[in-house]
């Protein structure tokens, strides 16, 4: 699998604190190894638009689509509680 980052994702990533960026980088490596890795807690977020959600940490999530052999990163944001 490969990774593609949308412009919207890059803007969100740039706004995230450095410790969140570092945690995200670790999580995306796990995603590349195994979509079902337990610490990602990846799940289908929006069935109609084929959007997935995965966990960065307790307070942050990232969103992506799977297009062929590519994970398209859409956003990384604080998790609304």
Write out the residue ranges for each language-model feature:
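Context-gated lysine
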Residues: 22, 27, 43-44, 81
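A short, surface-exposed loop/turn module that caps and links secondary-structure elements
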Residues: 29-54
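A short beta-strand-loop micro-motif that forms or neighbors metal/cofactor-
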Residues: 25-30, 76
